[in-house]
């Protein structure tokens, strides 16, 4: 889970994209709402190989649904599904008109989401609304004359609109019926302006029930009822915390509303309420999600989407009675004929091996996945390189796809130690098999180096239901050896908390270790990782949450780290910085990492993480220059059950030189700094034969140091450098495709210093699905004449940091007692004294 400081978000993002070459931009960047990685996955429709959205036909016998980015029709009691659309974009969220003639749906194409209308009688498919905005959740009025939907056309914010439709065409412009309102509330995950989503019509068409966070700080809001006209009267009929997926549906009897809720539990299930709210009760049960419910026309059945088996699936529930059945497309009739293509991936030894695959149509840029695979996609991309975001899936070694005739780009990767394979394949009318053999770039485990992702969330409110078994499969496909599944709250719920035991997951193997640990959330001090916990999750798992009983800034992170260490934990800060704060210009931050670095309560920094790597590296370098020895770790912050995610499992990873793969030995080597962190380039670095984490003690005088460096990378880089005390002291020339280099560099040492090796690109570059490729080693420390490493300027930087932080903390309104405040201010004071002494 990502943390932003109080620096201006617009400035921060601008700095990030400028450094990344201003190429890579978020999917659907016209949405002007913060924390896009949450609403994009939890609210916006996504390409999934299983069903994602369902609507009933005119009667009880027919269902229409989205699947694989196209629309389908299937009889309730049938086994054959008929495809109704076939691109060129991705089609979602069908809703059938009351007379059964039209489907209105949302279609992602041309860098926007438009509304389209499909005439089920003639087959004519035509645009209904294309305004360059994101238009979703279309719903027909009961008389078939209007469509209610949600659009970002007003200033990029979520509002409900209505559109009059006559004879299959829009009649007039859309009308915004919800009123824009600046709440002035300190919302951490949501926009300051209220949002309005998920409309559903009353049976007489005069009112809507919808979801809004008006007046609330946490969650996407409660259930509201309003007149279906601009500025209509609106009242809240029920409140509970929701996160984008409530999606109420009003029964035609006018009395009942079905919706999806996680009230008091970790998973969404179906609940019933009255049209005035009443006292809702739970209708379905299970440790998985049931979402997107829709009443049948006579209110005797409910169709919905479930992820009970991992992937999304379509179900129908009888009410009353409770009989539940899965609607399975056992045979598929495609709108455009398709041909079977089988992909077989083998290791250098010729054995089948798991890998990550991507199949993209050259003509349309559209991605395809097997029917039984989880479709996943990057959440940002360069529009000059592709029409849609990069899509991929994990394969166990053999995967079969049904594809329209045409030319496809097949891309195969397996972590960072195997070369990327890219092939162009022509698909004709005959079934075919395409074989892919992967080649190694490096075999780091043979040298005692084992990769790990220190920041993974197995389940975090995404489309899919992940399990340790599937997480292990994902890790094997990414050639990842250690997975730290960090249990963390998503507002009130804490997915995966039931998996914590204090031990390795029993599905771990000799080459893949899974540990369930914790990310500690605070809306103030900065997020952190607690690894290797033996006894318990630290609860409550958050602090500084306004308007809750956890509003206090105590426990601060120092207290949390002490609690973690008391049970053998290893502690670190995660996804740190988007920019380097300049305190001389009045910039501020709440981030507490300098406190814990000074007090010795943290063991590593996530230098490669969900942040700007060069900015984080620059702050880390300042810290190293004060004499603090803190190694680099790495973590993706991968939401492993998402369909749209910022990075796949293992995108950001740390390689640890533990010799053998043993969890506790691996953590000990991490703490000792025997690491390098990367999202692409692989590094080897030694100084006078000593590797990262080591110290070289030399007498007073001038000394020659011999650096041996190596680079192997699946992605080209622009710079390959040796850094001493934050300054480049050796630049290694890169030739050819700039993915490999070996060199010996002579350096001179006359004073104490730390040395790292790094490689990076100055712009986003495929196949690294990050702001830009970057890697750095932890330092080798050189001590000359017993003198400490010191920079008074950098020490003063942290004194200024703590001065502004102390002032903010002192005036915080959430303290439970003066004793709490004094304890925390005391921690800041001790840390300030540490840096002040080094500033002299």
List each language-model region with its residue ranges.
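Bacterial N-terminal signal peptides that target proteins for export
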Residues: 1-8
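Short edge beta-strand/loop segments characteristic of extracellular beta-sandwich folds
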Residues: 55, 211, 342-346, 706-712
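Long luminal/extracellular ectodomains of secretory-pathway precursor proteins
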Residues: 120, 124, 137, 146-149, ...
């Amino acid at each position: 889970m990502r943390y932003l400081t109080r620096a201006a978000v617009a400035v921060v993002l601008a700095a990030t994209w400028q450094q990344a070459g201003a190429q890579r931009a978020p999917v659907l960047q016209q949405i002007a709402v913060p924390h896009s990685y949450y609403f994009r996955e939890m609210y916006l429709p996504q390409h999934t190989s299983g069903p994602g959205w369902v609507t009933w036909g005119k009667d009880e016998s027919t269902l229409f649904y989205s699947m694989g980015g196209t629309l389908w029709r299937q009889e309730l009691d049938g086994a054959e599904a008929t495809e109704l659309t076939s691109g060129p974009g991705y089609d979602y969220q069908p809703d059938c008109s009351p007379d059964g003639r039209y489907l209105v749906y949302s279609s992602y194409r041309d860098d926007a989401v438009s509304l389209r209308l499909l005439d089920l009688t003639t087959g004519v498919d035509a645009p209904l609304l294309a305004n360059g905005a994101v238009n979703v959740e279309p719903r027909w009025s009961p008389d078939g004359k209007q469509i209610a939907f949600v659009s970002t056309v007003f200033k990029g914010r979520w509002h409900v609109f209505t559109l009059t439709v006559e004879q299959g065409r829009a009649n007039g412009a859309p009308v915004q019926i919800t009123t824009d309102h600046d709440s002035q509330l300190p919302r951490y995950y949501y926009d300051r302006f209220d949002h309005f989503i998920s409309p559903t019509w009353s049976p007489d068409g005069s009112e809507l029930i919808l979801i809004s966070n008006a007046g609330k700080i946490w969650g996407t809001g409660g259930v509201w009822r309003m007149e279906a006209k601009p500025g209509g009267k609106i009242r809240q009929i029920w409140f509970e915390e929701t996160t984008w997926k409530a999606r109420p549906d009003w029964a035609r009897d006018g009395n009942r509303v079905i919706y999806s809720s996680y009230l008091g539990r970790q998973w969404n299930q179906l609940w019933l309420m009255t049209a005035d709210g009443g006292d809702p009760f739970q209708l379905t049960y299970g440790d998985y999600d049931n979402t997107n419910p829709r009443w049948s026309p006579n209110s005797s059945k409910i169709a919905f989407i479930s992820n009970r088996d991992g992937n999304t699936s379509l179900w129908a529930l009888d009410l009353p009675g409770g009989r539940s059945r899965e609607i399975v497309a056992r045979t598929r009739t495609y709108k455009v004929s398709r041909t079977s293509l089988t992909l077989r991936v083998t290791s250098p030894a010729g054995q089948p091996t798991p890998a990550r695959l991507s199949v993209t149509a050259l003509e349309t840029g559209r991605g395809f996945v097997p029917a039984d695979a989880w479709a996943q996609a990057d959440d940002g991309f360069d529009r000059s390189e592709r029409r849609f975001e990069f899509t991929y899936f994990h394969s166990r070694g053999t995967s079969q796809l049904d594809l329209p005739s045409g030319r496809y780009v097949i891309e195969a990767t397996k972590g960072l130690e195997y070369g990327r394979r890219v092939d162009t394949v022509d698909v004709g009318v005959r079934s075919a098999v395409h074989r892919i053999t992967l080649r190694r770039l490096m075999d780091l485990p043979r040298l005692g180096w084992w990769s790990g992702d220190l920041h993974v969330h197995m389940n975090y409110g995404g489309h899919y239901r992940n399990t340790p078994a599937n997480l292990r499969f994902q890790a094997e496909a990414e050639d990842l050896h250690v997975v730290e599944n960090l249990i963390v709250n998503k507002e009130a719920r804490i997915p995966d908390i039931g998996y914590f035991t204090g031990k390795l997951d029993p599905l771990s193997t000799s080459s893949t270790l899974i540990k369930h640990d914790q990310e500690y959330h605070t809306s103030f001090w900065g997020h952190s990782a607690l690894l290797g916990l033996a006894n318990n999750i630290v609860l409550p798992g958050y602090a500084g949450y306004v308007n809750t009983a956890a509003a206090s800034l105590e426990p601060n992170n120092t207290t949390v780290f002490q609690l973690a260490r008391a049970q053998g934990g290893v502690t670190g800060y995660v996804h740190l910085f988007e920019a380097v704060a300049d305190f001389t210009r009045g910039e501020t931050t709440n981030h507490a990492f300098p406190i814990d670095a000074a007090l010795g309560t943290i063991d590593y920094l996530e230098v490669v993480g969900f942040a700007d790597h060069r900015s984080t590296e620059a702050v880390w370098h300042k810290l190293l220059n004060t004499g603090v020895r803190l190694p680099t770790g790495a973590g993706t912050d991968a939401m492993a059950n998402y369909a749209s995610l910022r990075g796949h499992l293992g995108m950001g990873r740390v390689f640890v030189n533990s010799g053998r793969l043993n969890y506790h030995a691996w953590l000990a080597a991490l703490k000792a700094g025997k690491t390098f962190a990367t999202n692409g380039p692989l590094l080897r670095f030694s100084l006078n034969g000593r590797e990262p984490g080591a110290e070289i003690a030399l007498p007073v005088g001038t000394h020659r140091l011999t650096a041996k460096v190596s680079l192997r990378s699946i992605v080209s880089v622009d710079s390959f450098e040796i850094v001493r005390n934050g300054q480049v002291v050796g630049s290694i020339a890169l030739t050819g495709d700039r993915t490999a280099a070996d060199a010996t560099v002579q350096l001179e040492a006359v004073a104490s210093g730390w040395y790292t090796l790094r490689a990076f690109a100055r712009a986003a570059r495929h196949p690294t699905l990050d702001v830009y490729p970057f890697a750095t080693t932890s330092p080798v420390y050189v001590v000359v004449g017993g003198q400490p490493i010191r920079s008074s300027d950098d020490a003063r930087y942290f004194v200024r940091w703590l001065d502004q932080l102390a002032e903010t903390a002192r005036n915080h309104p959430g303290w439970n007692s003066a004793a709490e405040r004094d304890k925390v201010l005391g921690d800041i004071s001790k840390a300030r004294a540490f840096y002040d002494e080094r500033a002299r």
